[in-house]
Amino acid sequence: MTFNSFEGSKTCVPADINKEEEFVEEFNRLKTFANFPSGSPVSASTLARAGFLYTGEGDTVRCFSCHAAVDRWQYGDSAVGRHRKVSPNCRFINGFYLENSATQSTNSGIQNGQYKVENYLGSRDHFALDRPSETHADYLLRTGQVVDISDTIYPRNPAMYSEEARLKSFQNWPDYAHLTPRELASAGLYYTGIGDQVQCFCCGGKLKNWEPCDRAWSEHRRHFPNCFFVLGRNLNIRSESDAVSSDRNFPNSTNLPRNPSMADYEARIFTFGTWIYSVNKEQLARAGFYALGEGDKVKCFHCGGGLTDWKPSEDPWEQHAKWYPGCKYLLEQKGQEYINNIHLTHSLEECLVRTTEKTPSLTRRIDDTIFQNPMVQEAIRMGFSFKDIKKIMEEKIQISGSNYKSLEVLVADLVNAQKDSMQDESSQTSLQKEISTEEQLRRLQEEKLCKICMDRNIAIVFVPCGHLVTCKQCAEAVDKCPMCYTVITFKQKIFMS
């Protein structure tokens, strides 16, 4: 699978706007904001949701549909409001893409204003069904209207609301399939009985042809970002008689804990007794787990998810998010952004560690996965190239098996890599010009010195320009970069070896 967004059937979009198809998808618009000013009062995601693309100049954005440009954003600005003000007849703001797809799909016999979409991925035919380019809820949210999705639309299959019910659908799951039924069911998916094809009980989206490095939750979110289950919204399924029956049979399908007696931290920590295993029992208890008394097996009191065979370096919260991302306790404690980031990181790690031959489609997938990482986007804003970031991330994952956990460490390694590269280039140049060893050493030492005091080593990267020129003490006294005179919005401390 690649990170390319879905494109609707061309019959759903008039010929005169075919060139706009690429940016009908919100994430394709968001990708243009890689170098958008990080200090903007209005976030890149908000602007992309309102139909804007980044122009690359200041904070100026432009609508992909009407091409109206807006800049000089202020705190409290409404992206949709300003868009509507400058271009009240914009097709995007007025729901043209949503309404057009609904009209076409109705004509083709598909209910609820939804049409078939496919993702062409070279040799891959991983696909999705029943997803419009913009969901009705997203349109109402964007235009400021009240979101009112009737229970007859969501979820698509109330009988599969509970994870247990979805898990039972995998009785004939093929042996060749790469993902486990438990992981798929946890991501809201149930087996359709055809090949390795699964379907979301909520949005109705279908996925198949799974690859070894795929993660169910990541792919669900990537292909169906507006799914209410993915977004963690309340589905209000209790109004459905089928759902009530399902709730009685499967208590875990509600927001209530699977094991209420273990809802308190003290109760969970008590179960660990004389815990002798490598993972800290306090961390396990805080992450919602209690001990089962069988080796290092633990179970979450809320979702009922179990884990075992712990490694010393594993973090309980991360493992909880990796294997049971739909857990309500996890969502309440850590938030959806944390869960998403964990899946982005693990998806990249497993692709790089397990795959020996990188096909063009897999390379694109890895690139897109790296690009989604918030740390990567911040490093790009600081002036580092995507090529250098990708290279150093791949090296770290191949060596250690894990990705970077903090921006500070990533930036430090990038700076050190640049320094090593500069040393190599300097060494080659010195040999060509027959410069003495003493001269080479002097130059390298000067490169590390603060360009203001020429006494202490450089230790601060200026954002957004990315220049590395001063020590910590001298950096405190400047508001503009001494190299390019750009106003400094943030000063990132780094460590040089």
Curated annotation (Swiss-Prot):
A zinc finger (RING-type) spans 450-485. GO terms for cellular component: cytoplasm; cytosol; nucleoplasm; nucleus. Changing F495A: Abolished E3 ubiquitin-protein ligase activity and ability to ubiquitinate RIPK2. Disulfide bonds: none annotated. CDD domains: BIR (cd00022), RING-HC_BIRC4_8 (cd16714), UBA_BIRC4_8 (cd14395). Its EC number is 2.3.2.27. Changing Y75G: Loss of interaction with TAB1/MAP3K7IP1. GO terms for molecular function: cysteine-type endopeptidase inhibitor activity; cysteine-type endopeptidase inhibitor activity involved in apoptotic process; identical protein binding; protein serine/threonine kinase binding; ubiquitin protein ligase activity; ubiquitin-protein transferase activity; zinc ion binding. Changing V86E: Loss of dimerization. Reduces activation of NF-kappa-B. Monomer, and homodimer. Part of a complex composed of SEPTIN4 isoform ARTS, XIAP and BCL2, within the complex interacts with SEPTIN4 isoform ARTS and BCL2, SEPTIN4 isoform ARTS acts as a scaffold protein and stabilizes the complex. Interacts (via BIR3 domain) with DIABLO/SMAC; the interaction inhibits apoptotic suppressor activity. Interacts with HTRA2/PRSS25; the interaction inhibits apoptotic suppressor activity. Interacts with TAB1/MAP3K7IP1 and AIFM1. Interaction with DIABLO/SMAC hinders binding of TAB1/MAP3K7IP1 and AIFM1. Interacts with TCF25 and COMMD1. This is E3 ubiquitin-protein ligase XIAP.
